[in-house]
A protein has these predicted regions:
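Long hydrophobic alpha-helices with heptad-repeat/coiled-coil character
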Residues: 47, 249, 264-265
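Conserved SGNH/GDSL esterase-like catalytic core that processes O-acyl groups on lipids
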Residues: 118-239, 245, 263
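Short amphipathic alpha-helices and their capping/turn segments at secondary-structure boundaries
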Residues: 85-101, 188-204, 244-253
């Protein structure tokens, strides 16, 4: 095993053990700072190997990447933006959405989307994540933001590159690997804070779409450590209501996509 690979493996273990330290406020500021530094170094090191020509060829040969949709394929955009900004979500059209954000776990973070080996699984390809990735266009990466960009080219908030939540390229995609419903309140506050600090976003005027895709780690992992599984369900329900109330209080003109965990695993 190469020395570089050994270092990366150690850092990946730290990533799993200290994931909650990164996603929530804590008193251990020095530990957080050191961990973030190591995590970013490992991330950058691995990202170089994903982007090389050999790995890109493997992705194409294995069918892991979408085939490019030629421009000859029509994409009609008639009647997809309101003449006047709607006051009600019930009259909202695709072109009316100005801002998009994503809250969730590894699926939202785009973990391992371009992986060809186990080491690559730790990379977070947010730019091509289905709910909040906007790299390229729908012809190359069919994501929700890329579809909405056809109707509103000024759409903002989507992630643009392979990145961590610490990177500017993640924008309003704040998904974190291994997150559970208990992480939603903090991630929601982060989204609200980033929106309010973004000069491109008018909180009162712009329509915003926030997608939640979280819960499998609660129901496929955490629930196994509870004597009464109903406690996990009740906790998830309580925290979900909490974040919906927080969004309602802080983000007017917001439509929420709530993607439930699969009924069968």
């Amino acid at each position: 095993m190469k020395h570089r690979d050994l270092v990366v493996i150690v850092l990946l273990h730290l990533n799993v053990m200290l994931r909650s330290v990164v996603t929530r406020p804590a008193e251990l500021d020095s530990l957080i700072g050191n961990f973030r530094h190591f995590r970013m170094e490992a991330f950058n090191l691995l990202n170089e190997t994903v982007s090389d020509e050999q790995n890109l060829r493997l992705l194409k040969q294995s069918g892991k990447v979408q085939r490019f949709v030629r421009k000859k394929t029509p994409c009609p955009l008639n009647n997809t933006k309101s003449a006047q900004t709607p006051e009600s979500v019930h009259k909202l059209r695709p072109g009316d959405i100005d801002v998009i954000a994503g809250i969730g776990d590894s699926l939202t973070a785009g973990v391992g989307l371009l992986a060809t080996n186990v080491m690559h699984v730790s990379l977070e390809h947010r730019g091509i994540a289905v709910t909040a990735g906007g790299k390229g266009s729908w012809r190359k990466y069919l994501t929700l933001p890329n579809m909405l960009k056809n109707f509103n080219p000024n759409l903002t908030g989507y992630a643009t590159e392979t990145s961590l939540t610490l990177h500017n390229e993640s924008h309003l995609n704040v998904g974190e690997t291994a997150s559970m419903s208990e992480d939603m309140p903090y991630m929601t506050r982060v989204v609200i804070k980033r929106m309010m600090e973004d000069d491109r976003i008018d909180i009162k005027k712009h329509w915003k779409m926030v997608t939640f895709m979280i819960g499998p780690n609660d129901f496929c992992s955490q629930i196994c450590f509870e004597n009464d599984f109903q406690k996990t369900l009740d906790k998830h329900r309580k925290e979900l209501r909490q974040v919906l109330a927080t969004l309602k209080q802080n983000l007017p003109r917001t439509i929420v996509n709530l993607i439930p965990p699969p009924m069968q695993i």
